[in-house]
Every structure is written in C-alpha cells, then in structure tokens.
Amino acid sequence: KHGEYKLVRLTKRIDDRLLPKVKIVDMRMELATRKKIAIFSTVLLDAIENTLKKGKQAIIFLNRRGFSTFISCKSCGLVLKCKRCDTVLVYHFEEKKLICHYCGYTQEPPEICPKCKSGYIKYLGLGTERVESEISRQFAQAHISRMDSDTTTKAGSHDSILGKFKSGETSILVGTQMIAKGLDFPEVTLVGVVSADVTLNIPDFRSSERTFNLLTQVAGRAGRGEHAGEVIVQTY
C-alpha cells in the first residue's frame, strides 16, 4: 500500500532453460512392493545409475545429519536422550558416539539398555552419514562427497568439497540444507530428496512453508546447464 515493497515474479529461468521435471515417489508403495524398508526407491537408484552412465552429476539431499537419528531398546522401548536437555541423541558412525545436536553433549553408545539391561539395542532413523554409506555400497565406482556441518568444520573443507564437485572429481554430492541454495553446477542433472517429510515433523507452525521453500531451493540445483534436469522426491 505504501510502495515500500514490490512483488517480483520470476516466471522462467535465465536463458529460457527448462525447469526440472519433478517426480514424487510414495515410499509406502515401495515398501509394499519390495517387502522391506529401503533408503532409496528403485526409481531413484535407476536415475542415479543413468546419470552416472551419462557422465553427469547428482545431488542427494537429506536435511538431517548423522548416521542413525536415534537408538532404541526393542525390549522396553527406551529411546536414549541427552542428560542435559532431554533431546534425542543421534548416533554418528565416524565418531562412534551419540551426540546431542542441540547442546553438544556426547556419550558412548551403550551395549545394553540402561533401563532394562536388555542387549536388544536398535539403531534407527536416517542421516546424511548413512545415506553416504549406502550410496557408496550401491555405486562402488562413483566418487562421493558429503557436505554437512560435520564435514565442514576444518578450515578450507567447505571450499575443498565444492571444488572437487565443480571440477567433476566428485560425481555425487550428499548433503543437508548447506547444498540447497546458491550452488550452480551445470553438470548436475539429478537431484534426489531422500525424505521430504523430515522438516515437516519439526515443531514449528511454519514447518510446511519451510519444507516447501527448502524443496524448491534444492530442486533448483538440477538442470542449470544445457541439459534438462530431473528431481525425485521420496516421501511417506
């Protein structure tokens, strides 16, 4: 009303480049077909394989770091939480520790349940560390990098990871929201979103808006060069 702000609409990409095609994969149907819980759908695995065969690059996005997002006793149901702030502890494979992402508290993972003394401890949930591990297993010949706040703590590590990806030394980049914005790599023709539901479950009344914004941003990393892009979004 006061003319202080103007609405600017971006109706197309620069140089009239095509927007990437977006495909939604219902992982519940995947579970029903394959009879097991899988990190990647057959659609995403096939897309990654085709991308690598063409000599192009892929970005795999999951906005959750760590290996297992919680560990639980299958006997009594106990979920291990931070002793300081009661936040669920996340297991990090490289450090071999449980870490609180809120206050930084760490502890060794228990061999038996501290409550019922059962040895039936399960590592559950999914983070970028596990995604990287699984992709390395599925595509052993591919060069893979992971970019999150765990891999970018050292000086120069951020530029090193992006430099290798830009040069083509790395063919698959796994990461959190750090890779969702501002990256322009013309050879990236595929973006895979492992679990689009992660940010929807955050206790914030704007979680749906933030999820849409994040998905829109990461989808924009695909097809920024001469070749058309594809985005595969896995959801439950």
What are these regions (language model features)?
Residues K1-Y236:
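Inter-lobe coupling/hinge segments of SF2-like helicase ATPases
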